[in-house]
Amino acid sequence: MYIKVKLMSNALEKINNFFKEKSWIKVFLIILMLMFVSFQLRAQTADMKFAQDNEFLKDMFSDEHGRMYLLALDPYYYLRLSENLYNNGHCGDTIKVVDGKETPYDLYQYAPPGHPLPWEPPVICLATLAIYYIWHSIDLTVTIMNAAFWVPAVLGMLLGIPIYFVVRRVTNSNIGGIAGAIALISAPGLLYKTCAGFADTPIFEVLPILFIVWFILESIHSQEKTALFKKDLKNPISLFVIAALIIELIIGAYLNIASGESVVIASILFYTVSLAFILAGLIIAGIKKLKGNELEFELFALLAVILTAVSPKMWGAWWYGFDVITAFLVIYIIALALLKSQVKIKEFINIGNLKNIVYLSIFYIFGSFVLLVAIYGMGIAISPITSPLGYNQILSTYTQTTGWPNVYTTVAELAKPSSWSEIFTNAIGSDTIAIVGILGILLSFLSLRYEKVKLDIKYSILLAIWLAVTLYAATKGIRFAALATPPLAIGLGIFVGQLERFLKMKSDIAIFGIGIPAGIFGLLILSKYSAKISQILLPTTYVPIIAYGFLIVLALLAIYKISDIISTLNDKKETIIKVSTLLLCIGVVIPPLSAVVPFSVAPTFNNGWKEGLDWIKANTPNNSVITCWWDNGHIYTYEARRMVTFDGGSQNSPRAYWVGRAFATSNENLSIGIIRMLATSGDEAFKKGSVLMNFTHNNVSKTVKILNEILPVDRSKAYDILTKKYGLSDKKAKLVLNATHPEHPNPDYLITYNRMTDIAPVWSMFGFWNFSLPPNTPNDKREKGAFFKGTAYYLGNGTILANVNVYTYSYVTLINSTNISTAIVQKINGQAKIIGTFKIHKLYIKTPLGVKELVLNKDGQLSEFIRIEADGRGYAWLATRNLEDSIYAKLHFLDGYGLKHIKLVKATIDPTDFGIQPGFKIYKVDYGTDYLK
């Protein structure tokens, strides 16, 4: 037994010595672990846990190979562009001549008329096709959608790397680096927008600045050694930097002046070369560090310059990161210059090489500016100066500027947060983590890297500026809260790292005041979350090589840590320190990880919708238009390849009023007039510069009033209204009528779906929009309608019972052959009690035998729709009175009852929301020819 223990002890000692001698292996394993953790968290969506093992639901939300569809809505826009790029060599649906030049053209978005696209493909499309080519070469069943699904998860593997190295640089603590990286990786807001399936651009809003900050801090750390600025042009680093800048300049300039199909090739070359230089720079830095050689600061500064030059292609607001770093460098230089003259405090503050810091700043700012000018032109290059001046207005989504309704006021992620707690929760998961992160930022001015207390102001300056800017943006719209995630995560990591550094001073105060409580904290967390440990370790096995690769890497790190602790058993203080810091790290990372395990999100696109959209694609003319509310527009254009009235990229337009009006009105002639106008001439009748807008001197209210008068009537009556009532000339009246009463209108298909019932307060508010009210009138002061959903039961003998939940009350209607009674029921102390009745103005009852329409009480403020299917299923809806005869209600609840020109042609399953089934409905709009009289 003794021999076995001795052998085990020797083996552990050898392992510990090995990791100490080859410390880079430990760092490599930590990086690998962080990459695997990030991927695993983001891959959970592929398991479709939302279905709860319901095979029907899994089949509905996946393709024929069982691979889940993309999440959200905007990813389908980029998916369509990616497929176009693969099939056509550009992102357009076709090529059109625009301003005398052949240009890729999007036929379907905001159509007619659609719009031109740049030749240069978005970076997300290139990333999608890169994964597709690799994966498809292995598995021929893989589609471009399948590849797009994994883009955010693959790129998300990079998120933790810069955080780990930044925190490690600040604190010299691997524990702190891991804690900070995990905090970022698991931040709920960021996780949702970068999980597998969310193939959108948020990943590109975060990644560039993370790496640029890391590169800048590494460059500052290497400030003592320079090559270029001491004119050592034969130095390999000097040659590499010069060559990289020249090549980037040439390729970037070529991309800027290229035209036509060569732009696609140039952009691929630009991204490839930029990535190659960044990877080469990191490899060079790694090799030099392994050899124990000092790095020249120009190397990491070059990487920061290259990535800054690429950033505008990833996100339109790229300049905020450049401004943060530039402000930091300027303030840091000023602070160092002031502190350098203070002889008494110089020994406590790390001043460093001020001259080289100035050189570094010039290199980064000027180098970035030159590349930006070459690649994009002067406009983009100076946008870090010009953009912030007008961005405050852009951030304020409630600003009304055109007289038309502002759709952004109804987009949840653009709403202003109600509290700091909401911002912090969206940014990093909880108020507690955010507060600790802020404390870490405050503590970052202390340098405890070498068990000595010194002041180092650079980290606190950078992080304070970064956090202040991002939190300010978050106060203008909750979607920007994710921008504050990186500085808060770094702050958390610094806090943990500083505690470890303080413990390593081995004072009794540190060990007993921090070490032992930290250990107890870790044990309590382990105990509290013990039931979820297995899920945290293995959240998914969808990609086995990653899942089990993570466990192997974690096991190797655990073996190292055990050997490290055992090697210190003879030194009780050292043992307490190592055990305490390990438990502290575990205690910090487990809560945020447990909060996102399991993690699942259901797609919107599904096979029920696919069936309906495929029907449109196969059975309608190519010039057909789909009229719908904007939210699902990208899905419709992707699957049906038909024009849509508006979508998630064009929602804030006058069409929001017109489409809302078409659904909310009870006037069928007005509704089809609106649809006919939008489907054929788009915005021609009401855009700025149109006949009516010029006639009314850009008075939107008057323009809308005129159009609402002429759209429901035939052409001759509309002509009389325009010429006799409003005094337009014959020529101008006919120009208006060409847009509103076209001779050759595009066919139109209306789509309704169950969620439209839920969001009726939104589209009806726009449909009932009162243009005479001040533009900044709050939404809650405007007229809107609503529907409340419930169930209905046929009890036999002509008796029907309907139950609709309205907030916390049940509105019950009992109908029999002789009487209709109502009751409002509330649960009080667990008992259902009738607390009153309600008055129904109009009642619609649809059965397999037909529709019965009854007016019950002229004073009723609610109306009710009841639908009983042949198989016994029953549905009920309460409606506000202003929507009781709306086109939407008659279409979705009654299948077009009472309408002459809009007919149901296809209905398929809608599994996305509770409601009528089949609930995805397609209607053909028949304009007829009478309107041309």
Swiss-Prot record:
GO terms for biological process: protein glycosylation; S-layer organization. It comes from the Archaea. Residues 44-146, 196, 258-263, 318, 383-427, 476-479, 603-933 are extracellular. It catalyses: an archaeal dolichyl phosphooligosaccharide + [protein]-L-asparagine = an archaeal dolichyl phosphate + a glycoprotein with the oligosaccharide chain attached by N-beta-D-glycosyl linkage to a protein L-asparagine. InterPro entries: Oligo_trans_STT3, STT3-PglB_core, STT3_N. Its cofactor is Mn(2+); Mg(2+). Mn(2+) binds at residues 74, 200, 413. The keyword Isomerase does not apply. A motif (WWDYG motif) lies at residues 629-633. This is Dolichyl-phosphooligosaccharide-protein glycotransferase. The lineage of its organism: Archaea, Methanobacteriati, Methanobacteriota, Methanomada group, Methanococci.
